[in-house]
Amino acid sequence: MNAITLVHSGHVPVMLHEVLEALSPRAGGRYLDGTFGGGGYARAILNAADCTLDAIDRDPAAIERGNAMAVQANGRLRMHQGTFGDMEALAGAEGPFDGIVLDLGVSSFQIDQAERGFSFRNDGPLDMRMGSDGPSAADLVNTCKEAELADILYRYGEEKLSRRIARAIVAARAEAPITTTGQLAHIIRCCVPRDRANIDPATRSFQGLRIAVNDELGELERALEAAPRLLAPGGIFVVVTFHSLEDRLAKRAMAVLAGRTGNPSRYEPAPLRQEAPAFSLLYSRPLSATDEESRENPRARSARLRALVCNPAPKMPVSGMPS
């Protein structure tokens, strides 16, 4: 098994040690990376064991990086272009999988490239699309009604001053279209005070627009529904989230699958038989990045890792024998 070394030097995968510990790649295993990005998880999984890996990404640049890595992997890596919400259609035929991992949010490649339009620190075209299809952030900012903009910023960015920001955006675009990240960031900064934590006032609004442009929560909901069906018995599903909206969805979906939906009402009749859940939580609480990793990689500070295990089917008693 040749070690795979082709990973862009600027990419730092978050909570890599914890992801590998949860997945525990084994020889002959089959794994799925739903968010290839810079290939950090993919490389680590393939180097950890003589296994096979299917990887998904909607970004053509990520697919190009993955295809280059696949040459080194000698047939152990297969790339699929598309969204991880469509993992069943894209890679389901290659399963069932012994492990599936999702690293949500924007990759460092996308943030660092001003021309992708994700960053409010570097001026570039107001795009924010992880792929190449669909409306851009500029389309939303320049065409949505004020109430729609406010709703996007509030729901997806959790921005309390969403109405004020939406009003300022509509006033600014009446003078001239908003086409760059620098323009938008300036508009937001002019009407939102910097908070005590010294977080840039544009942070939440940019998050809200990015989530809306890429339908990130819809993709996650579809993935949370599909991934459990693709797991082999004993398989592990790992999700790394970066903000509370993602984490709440992952927490709720995994709790339901693991039968952790709370105690039934005392007024409801008790079920005749309690079925063993098909899944279990690998950790009772989400894991966070270590202090050392958070210092070295600020993006890791908000990361939370949750994991689900597909329980082996219970053995059925032999007919005629006592159970």
Curated annotation (Swiss-Prot):
The enzyme's E.C. designation: 2.1.1.199
Family: Belongs to the methyltransferase superfamily. RsmH family.
GO aspect biological process, one term: rRNA base methylation
Molecular function GO labels: rRNA (cytosine-N4-)-methyltransferase activity
Name used for this protein in its record: Ribosomal RNA small subunit methyltransferase H
Gene: rsmH
GO annotations of cellular component type: cytoplasm
Gene3D superfamilies cross-referenced by the UniProt entry: Putative methyltransferase TM0872, insert domain (1.10.150.170), Vaccinia Virus protein VP39 (3.40.50.150)
UniProt keyword annotation of Translocase present: no
Catalytic activity: cytidine(1402) in 16S rRNA + S-adenosyl-L-methionine = N(4)-methylcytidine(1402) in 16S rRNA + S-adenosyl-L-homocysteine + H(+)
A Pfam family: Methyltransf_5
Residue sites binding S-adenosyl-L-methionine per the record: 39-41, 57, 84, 103, 110
Domain of life: Bacteria
Keyword Cell division: no
Keywords assigned by UniProt, alphabetized: Cytoplasm, Methyltransferase, rRNA processing, S-adenosyl-L-methionine, Transferase
Role noted for this protein: Specifically methylates the N4 position of cytidine in position 1402 (C1402) of 16S rRNA.
Major localization class: cytoplasm
Compartment annotation: Cytoplasm
